[in-house]
Amino acid sequence: MAHKKGASSSRNGRDSNAQRLGVKRFGGQLVNAGEIIVRQRGTHFHPGDGVGRGGDDTLFALRDGNVEFGTRRGRRVVNVTPVEAPVEA
């Protein structure tokens, strides 16, 4: 079994694809139910009110509303607060 491959061969040339992680909807933005808010590995952000967590720790909106980032018990949380409908006079 040769371990030297020859003159025009290389052991390099492999790389993995980017995972495209990060915050997808920022604080104050409107979201619809089901929209992804944060893609993450582990729980860097925790789900708050109106936010669900997928099997790969992705946070998504459970209802329509505004995205809010905050803290609860020393943890960074993401909430979705419902938008108040304008009142007709």
Swiss-Prot record:
NCBIfam families: L27
Family named by the database record: Belongs to the bacterial ribosomal protein bL27 family.
InterPro entries with a match to the protein in the record: Ribosomal_bL27, Ribosomal_bL27_CS
One GO term describing the cellular component: cytosolic large ribosomal subunit
PROSITE patterns documented for this protein: RIBOSOMAL_L27 (PS00831)
Stretches with biased composition (Polar residues): 7-19
Gene: rpmA
Protein name (record): Large ribosomal subunit protein bL27
HAMAP family, A to Z: Ribosomal_bL27
Keywords, ordered alphabetically: Ribonucleoprotein, Ribosomal protein
Pfam families: Ribosomal_L27
Keyword Ribosomal protein: yes
GO molecular function term, any single one: structural constituent of ribosome
Domain of life where this protein originates: Bacteria
Ribonucleoprotein keyword on record: yes
